[in-house]
């Protein structure tokens, strides 16, 4: 299955308007944003766990990163409340679930296969000082990509010139980019060479952002 798999094109998905699609596990549904592959896939999705649902134990052959959007995500290693960013590199494993239900933004098979750095962060706790109406937290950096949490005050202008492409998920508030008004859970992907030039709405905006990574996009090596 290929979905938004041409990484040379600009893509906007208003995920709040996308229907949920049932996963193979009962009680776990997905909104797919981009995908190369079937059940083993390089994938970007929003995933919803119903209360009491769980996924079977599995190993992250290609790595997994996620941000908890709502509720509390759980596995045998602990609880991950909303606002937690997690990187589970290749070879890690767990049995995920959510006793009270949760929603996460998750990316699969998008790691350097030699990466072994595993961590979790409270994104709010990482924020730096406000400059020109914008506060930033760098969540992860390596030779392939930079992952950030960005908070914009009302009307703040955000410009990113990062090579290698840009990807943004709006977590709260609104963001104007080109002719599009991005709202909560709107997802934007800009191809390599296209700058991000956006302005926060009247309530400001909170964003998850990744830059530099699109040249490495490929189907899982299985």
Q: Locations of the language-model features?
A:
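Regulatory nucleotide-sensing modules
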Residues: 139, 144, 153-160
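Glycine- and acidic-residue-biased ligand/ion/polar-headgroup-sensing regions
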Residues: 51, 60-75, 163-178, 184
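Histidine-centered metal-chelating micro-motifs
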Residues: 53-56, 74, 86-95, 157-158, ...
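The feature marks the first
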Residues: 28-32, 36-74
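A short, N-terminal "cap"/entry segment at the start of jelly-roll beta-barrel domains
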Residues: 1-39, 99-144, 148, 222
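Ligand-binding loop in jelly-roll beta-barrel domains
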Residues: 28, 79, 90-114, 181, ...
């Amino acid at each position: 299955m290929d979905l938004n798999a041409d990484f040379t094109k600009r893509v906007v998905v208003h995920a709040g308007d996308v229907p949920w699609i049932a996963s193979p596990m009962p009680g776990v549904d997905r909104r797919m944003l981009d995908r190369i592959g079937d059940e083993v896939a390089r994938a970007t999705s929003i995933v919803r766990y119903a209360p009491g649902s769980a996924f079977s134990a599995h190993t992250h052959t290609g790595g997994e990163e996620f941000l908890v959007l709502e509720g509390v995500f759980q596995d045998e290693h602990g609880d991950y409340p909303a606002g937690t960013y997690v990187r589970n590199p290749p070879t890690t494993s767990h049995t995920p679930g959510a006793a009270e239900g949760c929603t996460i933004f998750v990316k699969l098979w998008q790691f350097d296969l030699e990466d072994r750095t595993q961590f979790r962060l409270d994104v709010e706790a990482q924020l730096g000082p406000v400059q020109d109406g914008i506060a930033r937290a760098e969540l992860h950096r390596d030779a392939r990509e930079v992952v950030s949490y960005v908070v914009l005050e009302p009307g703040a202008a955000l410009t990113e010139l990062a090579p290698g492409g840009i990807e943004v998920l709006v977590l709260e508030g609104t963001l104007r980019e080109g002719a599009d008004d991005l709202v909560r859970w709107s997802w934007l992907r800009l191809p390599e060479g296209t700058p991000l030039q956006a302005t926060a709405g009247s309530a400001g905006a909170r964003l998850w952002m990744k830059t530099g990574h699109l040249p490495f996009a490929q189907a899982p090596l299985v």
